Amino acid sequence: MAAGPETDAVVAGMACKPARMPIEIRVTTPDEYRAAADVFRGALLSPRSTDDDWAKPSIVDSWSDGHSVSAWEGARCVGHASAFHFTTVVPGGATVPTAAITRIGVRQTHTRQGVLTRAMHRLLHDAVAQGKVLASLRASEAVIYGRFGFAVAGETWS
């Protein structure tokens, strides 16, 4: 068994994983948007964003319009989640402030280590502090988010 990016040694035929640095969950700053975007795109198996992508004001604006948290291991972004500011019409016609959660991703090297859980907890905590009454989520893997209180609200079949 050879040592690779996830191993630092081979001892008696067993790969040994290196000790991980602590992971910090924090609000994503504008100069960190691109690193966060690359984590999200990687989670979707999409190519990294390009300089041309970030030259478009619409791309930069889309990252500035909401609230974003990222997981950092040292200087490397390893996870991300964000929420757009939104309003939802509820029964009776009232509108309530909503956190429209999106752009969730974790690097493959950091899955199943609590990165998503910590990022979602921070994002939802921040949403409450910002006065959001609801949180909505459109996910490709809806079952993952049940532990945060989300469930399928409807299905469309044709």
Regions found by a protein language model. Name each.
Residues 14-85, 91-100:
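Short amphipathic alpha-helix that is part of the acyltransferase structural core
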